[in-house]
Amino acid sequence: MKVKVGINGYGTIGKRVAYAVTRQDDMKLIGVTKTKPDFEAYRAKELGIPVYAAGEEFLPRFENAGFEVAGTLSDLLEKVDVIVDATPGGMGAKNKAVYEKAGVKAIFQGGEKASTAEVSFVAQANYEKALGKDYVRVVSCNTTGLIRTLSAVQEYIDYVYAVMIRRAADPNDIKHGPINAIKPSVTVPSHHGPDVQTVIPINIETSAFVVPTTIMHVHSIMVELKKPLEAKDVIDIFENTTRVLLFEKEKGFESTAQLIEFARDLHREWNNLYEIAVWKESISVRGNRLFYIQAVHQESDVVPENIDAIRAMFEMADKWESIRKTNQSLGILK
Amino acid sequence: MKVKVGINGYGTIGKRVAYAVTRQDDMKLIGVTKTKPDFEAYRAKELGIPVYAAGEEFLPRFENAGFEVAGTLSDLLEKVDVIVDATPGGMGAKNKAVYEKAGVKAIFQGGEKASTAEVSFVAQANYEKALGKDYVRVVSCNTTGLIRTLSAVQEYIDYVYAVMIRRAADPNDIKHGPINAIKPSVTVPSHHGPDVQTVIPINIETSAFVVPTTIMHVHSIMVELKKPLEAKDVIDIFENTTRVLLFEKEKGFESTAQLIEFARDLHREWNNLYEIAVWKESISVRGNRLFYIQAVHQESDVVPENIDAIRAMFEMADKWESIRKTNQSLGILK
Amino acid sequence: MKVKVGINGYGTIGKRVAYAVTRQDDMKLIGVTKTKPDFEAYRAKELGIPVYAAGEEFLPRFENAGFEVAGTLSDLLEKVDVIVDATPGGMGAKNKAVYEKAGVKAIFQGGEKASTAEVSFVAQANYEKALGKDYVRVVSCNTTGLIRTLSAVQEYIDYVYAVMIRRAADPNDIKHGPINAIKPSVTVPSHHGPDVQTVIPINIETSAFVVPTTIMHVHSIMVELKKPLEAKDVIDIFENTTRVLLFEKEKGFESTAQLIEFARDLHREWNNLYEIAVWKESISVRGNRLFYIQAVHQESDVVPENIDAIRAMFEMADKWESIRKTNQSLGILK
Amino acid sequence: MKVKVGINGYGTIGKRVAYAVTRQDDMKLIGVTKTKPDFEAYRAKELGIPVYAAGEEFLPRFENAGFEVAGTLSDLLEKVDVIVDATPGGMGAKNKAVYEKAGVKAIFQGGEKASTAEVSFVAQANYEKALGKDYVRVVSCNTTGLIRTLSAVQEYIDYVYAVMIRRAADPNDIKHGPINAIKPSVTVPSHHGPDVQTVIPINIETSAFVVPTTIMHVHSIMVELKKPLEAKDVIDIFENTTRVLLFEKEKGFESTAQLIEFARDLHREWNNLYEIAVWKESISVRGNRLFYIQAVHQESDVVPENIDAIRAMFEMADKWESIRKTNQSLGILK
């Protein structure tokens, strides 16, 4: 028996999760919702994915364009075991009542508050916490990135200070700026530290900045250690951490541009770089402080988490079995 | 018997042509050259592609990195029937003597002068001119884009004025600016008009501007017609023109960003958009003037031309057979 | 007697016009309006300019911040002879009824429709048309730029095709993108041609593109001539045209960045470049076609027009006297 | 008697220092050097500043352009008491021998190694160290920014970790990228920490990133305190620190764009923001850690330091007298 999955919202995250679902042997994609018949909707149809209107209010748009939908969100909810809410931040909380009423489990994304779900989730950090749950929140791309590497060195952490340099808009988003400025979150520490703490109990503070780029976030991480650790140990640890990859500037990885080029060279779908990219040369320890720099592909790093969350919620596999299946199906390198 | 192909230069164009060669049933990729052992070189090796040093002077770099090469360019030249020169603009002309001495045919890219080769080439416009030739130049990405659409309406053209708004650097190139300025080619008309004339004999003048974007060029084209033509005729013509696609703003194609997203949604390798993208709504005729706007994916539009040029040079197929084979092998939509 | 001037909207255009008014010996700045007490409002106060709330609904914002205003827009209207409406595009039309009721003359900006005012205005092209009028529209930055140079060669024009490459946002605007894309106006010809025709009766068609830069627009202009003209004649004409300056790439003016640097080197307030910048080397004539490239500083080129419009509306000076006074007071080079 | 000052290199820094010299009542600008007759050279001439060729090898360029120079660098050196070396990074060290031979004192910029000069200099931190010296290095824009604020809280500092988000190119520089990427300095800690230590003896580590913007650098600073300090104390301290200004997001200072707009609104020459801009809301203390965010106008923050350095080298004024004179002459707010 395959778990029947619906996706509410077929944008940057939704379409990637939909694709990932189709790559699993224990899941079936039932349908996706759209608010308008744009090229992404046509592409879904071309792929044979049933497209539902995200609400009755959107039906006229589809009718006017002659785009036949399979129904509305409520129709979709009747057919699925779980809905992945990939709507814009804050809407998931509003949708929750609808999912509850329909009696379907739901996964929310990091744009929702932690309180929207029973557990906040990063597979390699707390898979077990989501076992059997009805409502799970996959944390944001940045938080996922922090947790992937920090959970790997968690036992050494006394305190973390992370500075996040964030892309201002996704490649497909032409509405948002800035075009030529740096915009700080002036409230320091920023909200990302507490968000990490919804998954792993570490002492962490962060600050965040928006810069005019579209392709990846970058994190400058400093860890105050509570027991000795050398740079080569950290390299070993990260080499053995799933969904974390080391990249060398010496091989030409000078910026986020070459990391994306790496994903393109692999012919990854949408140049997804599901793995967190750590610059190997940046890993250093001075006294009791560990430093490293990592980059996060905001469009895709949470995709495997959504798949693993489904398995945990239906208790379909244990942690490492799920991670292994997800990794293998998506071509995640390790 | 398959034609044995080498690629001199495994960068933006070279790696795409190499990939395209591996997709042909009548060609065999013998090897590629690199000047340094960067991640692209490692990727080639992973793919089982023999990597040669682009010259003896580069051997120490590979040796120091412990990267084993299959030889140097001269070794590669001994094994191939044709070399695709994908070196930086201007270097091809210098390399020509080496190719001549080795007795191999050669394809040059648009960064070289027309006089470097016997013929300048765009498959759908002048395939036959390259039949049996030893030296063929595939024209630049911009010139290819102009010729694809203009050759389709060639009989109607009295005069063309095209304004090219060019991306300043490729996605993988972080060296070049500008970051926040528009840079005109102050010599008007620019060199692109005469370059078009190396392939089709039309009356054309152009101007060109560099702007801070990495993903696509855009052309604003105005054609003075010598006989009547309506917008709907042009739509028909372009719908029946190979390697040209119509995109509608109404479906969400508001900018070059969504065109690239379309290629990503198709899971095209490196988000290649081999086809020239014409905005359907932009096609209009007022009096004796036709207007339209098109976008060019500078990283990939010349790739199919390189493949077709090989077939023409070895007289392996006639024009439409070659175009059909190339299109099918690369997933080109029409 | 000085004309009493109020400014409704103290943003990019409003603050520059306010400054310009203070530089005139025949005008008096009575006050400006703001919707919120931001740093621009504080700066106005520092300069001794009375600040009014743009409406009663905005008063609480000022009160909460402890920022004392001099009243609201209606109070300001009681004290002025003319109001310069520098509100966001489209709001001017709505404000007109208020101005009419208050019995004050009004100047609108290019974001309003031509029908909002009795005349659309560029001083050097049609100053006389505005004499004694109550409602005048200063056309947009792009339209002003086109008219400054085209009116200088008007008698030679058979047809104009202009391509506008537009900055996506002003330097102070961090909300708007795109960050990495080119966005065409897919309706060709664009609305700019008809807008030019509200001032000068020439045959003109245009297309327009938005690109990720903040500092200047650039226009690529092609004129089909109805009588012979040589490039050197055009250079002579432009050298004798007010508010048009020739710049040479040879002297380092390679892009819009160096044009702004020129204004900064002059210590112009806000690096205003009131003059339209034409690249001298770009001026060329081939057959019956004239080509040239110009750049427009969108933040400031319409400022002198607002001043001249005031003089025309109150019949304070004839055309060349007003232009001379305005130029001299603002340091316009010619 | 006024000190006679020459400027070697009339680019971004050189032209600003030249201007600043002309604003001092105890200095006289003798001349500046250029390598080519570009618009900056013409502007210097317009301002009545003698222009010298930066070397004999550059004379033909000036001759060909009909630009009359006042001589070469060696002629200039004969006439001055001190030369401000504002040549590109690394050239100053090479020029030092020439200055020594000519027997003139010299100021170097932060692109040179500390060992090039006798002392590295930030006026408010170590003015006295430069008294009577022959060779002084004004540290880089970023290092100056760090020292201005950190020296004000120096007695509280146990350890500093600063992350620098750097503009990729100056507004006038269209050669350098990246256009759409973030580029880390992968060697962590970066060289900026040791550079701070050439001026003040604090325990500091840094990391650095280049992002696609041209207008300002931003620093995210975390200080581990060795004695208690509250946010309001830090606000008090910074309010009383020269060349440091507090800006509030609440007043509209959301990004670096509005900081530059502030300087433009002041009609500062070249929109210079000589002062370091600290976001008031960002100042916070949590436990023993102080956080704050600041921005640095890379084109101008070192200009007052160059002026103060001259006074120190000739023992023309004591520290606070010099700072006061420099501030007043340049309109520095405090």
UniProtKB/Swiss-Prot annotation, chains A, B, C, D:
GO cellular component, one term: cytoplasm
GO molecular function: 4-hydroxy-tetrahydrodipicolinate reductase; glyceraldehyde-3-phosphate dehydrogenase (NAD+) (phosphorylating) activity; glyceraldehyde-3-phosphate dehydrogenase (NADP+) (phosphorylating) activity; NAD binding; NADP binding
GO biological process: glycolytic process; lysine biosynthetic process via diaminopimelate
EC numbers for this chain: 1.2.1.59
Binding site for D-glyceraldehyde 3-phosphate: 140-142, 192-193
Keyword Oxidoreductase recorded: yes
Gene3D superfamilies: Dihydrodipicolinate Reductase, domain 2, NAD(P)-binding Rossmann-like Domain
Major subcellular location class: cytoplasm
Keyword Metal-binding appears in the UniProt entry: no
Bridged cysteine pairs (disulfide): none
InterPro entries: DapB_N (IPR000846), GlycerAld/Erythrose_P_DH (IPR020831), GlycerAld_3-P_DH_AS (IPR020830), GlycerAld_3-P_DH_cat (IPR020829), GlycerAld_3-P_DH_NAD(P)-bd (IPR020828), Glyceraldehyde-3-P_DH_2_arc (IPR006436), NAD(P)-bd_dom_sf (IPR036291)
Localization of this protein: Cytoplasm
Family: Belongs to the glyceraldehyde-3-phosphate dehydrogenase family.
Protein name: Glyceraldehyde-3-phosphate dehydrogenase
Natural source organism: Thermococcus onnurineus (strain NA1)
Annotated gene: gap
